[in-house]
Regions:
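Active-site beta-to-alpha loop of glycosyltransferases that engages the nucleotide-sugar donor
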Residues: 2-21, 36
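Catalytic-site signature of metal-activated, phosphate-bearing donor transferases
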Residues: 65-76, 96-236
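The conserved acidic donor/metal-binding loop of glycosyltransferases
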Residues: 90-94
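Generic recognition of short, well-ordered alpha-helical segments
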Residues: 17-18, 43, 98-102
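Acidic donor-binding segment of Leloir-type glycosyltransferases
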Residues: 22-61
């Protein structure tokens, strides 16, 4: 079984070391789409040798969701026949399981995996530390918005189509069996309690169950005021 990870990076010299340290523990290959970074992002990625491939692209110094979605779809095409599972995420998104390779093998009939999302928070960014980021930042809150389609099983499904923002897939897709922290029989499609996006409202009601889910996504965005403000300035 082969697991590949794809990540889009733009001046990620602070976060990328933690990202690579985590995903290199279970991925057979990591592809970094580098958006013409002007810091040490590329050098950090290349320090991992053959495990990491750097693919440059240029969005014209702007955050462009449509470019990112196209990169994701091309990633699936490129990985087909080479990888069994593909993880598609941002640099601050850490798919976590105590034994993820065994988990994927045990659920190899699932087409798409939606890890239970958590918004992780700390007072400051943990700079220049050894070990995993989740060894230092362990507090967060469940987040249905970050319960995203992040792992694709290429042995079951060939292509998927994200909606803008890549937090959800085209609702017209037939995914067959897929893994989601909210049981399918209580995950409504359409309006629910006057909320147009019914399933998001339902997830808010059962957030207390998220911590018991074996597959999680730890989103490390709010790691101190300085780190957050600098990221927003980059995207402005």
């Amino acid at each position: 079984m082969k697991v590949w990870a794809y990540v889009i990076a733009w001046n990620e010299e602070l976060m990328l070391p933690y990202y690579l340290r985590h995903y290199s523990t279970f991925c057979d290959k990591i592809i970094v789409y580098d958006n013409m970074s002007t810091d040490s992002t590329r050098m950090i990625a290349e320090s991992y040798g053959d495990l990491v491939e750097v693919v440059p692209f240029d969005s014209g110094e702007e955050f462009n969701d449509y470019v990112h979605i196209e990169l994701k779809r091309n990633s699936l095409k490129n990985a087909k026949g080479n990888a069994d599972f593909v993880i598609l995420c941002d640099c601050d998104e850490f798919v976590f399981h105590k034994d993820i390779r065994s988990f994927l093998n045990d659920n190899k009939d699932c087409s798409v995996f939606y890890p239970a999302g958590f918004q992780m928070i700390s007072d400051d960014f943990p700079k220049d530390l050894e070990g995993q980021l989740y060894d230092y930042v362990q507090w967060g809150e469940p987040s249905p918005w970050y319960t995203k389609p992040m792992i694709i099983n290429l042995n079951v499904i060939d292509d998927v189509n994200w909606v803008e923002g890549a937090h959800e897939l085209d609702p017209n897709l037939n995914l067959g069996s897929f893994w989601h922290p909210v049981p399918e029989d209580i995950r409504p499609i359409g309006e629910y309690k006057e909320h147009v996006w019914g399933k998001w409202q339902k997830m808010w009601e059962i957030l207390d169950t998220f911590n018991s889910k074996p597959l999680k996504m730890l989103h490390y965005k709010y790691l101190g005021a300085d780190y957050v403000s600098n990221r927003y300035k980059l995207y402005a």
